[in-house]
Amino acid sequence: MQESLTLQPIARVDGTINLPGSKSVSNRALLLAALAKGTTTLTNLLDSDDVRHMLNALNALGVHYSLSDDRTRCEIQGQGGPFNTLVELELFLGNAGTAMRPLAAALCLGTNNVVLTGEPRMKERPIGHLVDALRQGGADVTYLEQENYPPLHLKGGFTGGNVTVDGSVSSQFLTALLMAAPLAPGNTAIDIKGELVSKPYIDITLHLMKTFGVEVENQNYQRFVIQGGQQYQSPGHYLVEGDASSASYFLAAAAIKGGTVKVTGIGRNSVQGDIRFADVLEKMGAHITWGDDFISCTRGELNAIDMDMNHIPDAAMTIATTALFAKGTTTLRNIYNWRVKETDRLAAMATELRKVGATVEEGHDFITVTPPAQLQFADIGTYNDHRMAMCFSLVALSDTPVTILDPKCTAKTFPNYFAQLARISHSA
């Protein structure tokens, strides 16, 4: 029997949420700390499935680290260079794209004999554009099942040179190449083909590389030049920011049924592009206050928007369910990459929004949402996708309860999400 959680109608939300660490930052920081010279202490590390997959992989690759009891503080002894595996290894990475893509590139350095695999859904998530680019730089990569998809067999061989990568499907392919390139023996120039999606995620990568002592020449996000033969240097300590994508649910809840909700651990100077989600809520009519270490949102009369969401694809999902509480028809554009995430998020979102009574048009790379006069009670399928579960929890901010199937799928990024939501929720 599938587990489910029924949320009763929430009359008001009010309070403060201390955000768990960012998934995007946590997994990048772990990998760079492992490759760096010196010992790095990471604090506010996210404790979630995706991060555990990265930690397990690093452990199997011979990286020594110690974790605090709550798994949010990690001390890592850096290897001072690429991984070199002496025996054949198979690493299981679940459905963690933030582990699969960067590790695939990192294991193309040095001498390796490693298979990367994961859950059935991971084997449906494309990686061909990354593999093509790695091969251009000399890497020895073999597909073990379906061409262009994991599992992959990696044997090193990447030396640098001129490579081209398609930027239109996932920014993680470029992130993976950028993080590996400084450790290649030769210089690397990466040219971007097509429109680069999710640019702010590249900024996270460049920020972290700089933190670990490596500069990248960024030519207007069209070409990146990286000197080879470098070494990452531990910064000693690094504080992982709160997860801005996770913040979106609480800020949206406040916009719909505040009170005021304040999220801490991110602020106006955050490196994560998903903080721009707050600007979208403001455009819809909510009231936003920015601090150095917080963002707060107070309820406002919400109106529909029509916006390009390419810069905040993960947080944009939250707007799709927030639209149920806005006046008019909301249109989210340029979100094709929803289709290659944990599930085909465009199809899933359209299906589940219709269940609660919304009128939805699902396009190739856009979605329109028109709210019903009254939301309908429904069992919401979550497709083993943490964000589907969290987005649809917002339905309870109406007069209608909602049942979330497989609520534990939030463990991918936010294991105690529903407990945190309950903390700020007040019933009538």
Swiss-Prot record:
Organism: Cronobacter sakazakii (strain ATCC BAA-894)
Annotated pathway: Metabolic intermediate biosynthesis; chorismate biosynthesis; chorismate from D-erythrose 4-phosphate and phosphoenolpyruvate: step 6/7
Root EC class: transferase
A GO biological process held by the record: aromatic amino acid family biosynthetic process
Chain's gene name: aroA
Family, per entry: Belongs to the EPSP synthase family.
Protein's UniProt keywords contain Amino-acid biosynthesis: yes
Protein name: 3-phosphoshikimate 1-carboxyvinyltransferase
MF (Gene Ontology): 3-phosphoshikimate 1-carboxyvinyltransferase activity
Subcellular location(s) per record: Cytoplasm
Active site: residue positions: D314
Quaternary structure annotation from Swiss-Prot or TrEMBL: Monomer.
Pfam families listed in its UniProt record: EPSP_synthase
UniProtKB keywords: Amino-acid biosynthesis, Aromatic amino acid biosynthesis, Cytoplasm, Transferase
UniProt keyword Transmembrane helix, yes or no: no
Chain's role: Catalyzes the transfer of the enolpyruvyl moiety of phosphoenolpyruvate (PEP) to the 5-hydroxyl of shikimate-3-phosphate (S3P) to produce enolpyruvyl shikimate-3-phosphate and inorganic phosphate.
Phylogenetic placement of the source organism: Bacteria, Pseudomonadati, Pseudomonadota, Gammaproteobacteria, Enterobacterales
GO terms for cellular component: cytoplasm
Sequence positions that bind 3-phosphoshikimate: K23, S24, R28, S170, S171, Q172, S198, D314, N337, K341
Catalytic activity: 3-phosphoshikimate + phosphoenolpyruvate = 5-O-(1-carboxyvinyl)-3-phosphoshikimate + phosphate
Binding site for phosphoenolpyruvate: K23, G97, R125, Q172, R345, R387, K412
UniProt-listed Enzyme Commission number(s): 2.5.1.19
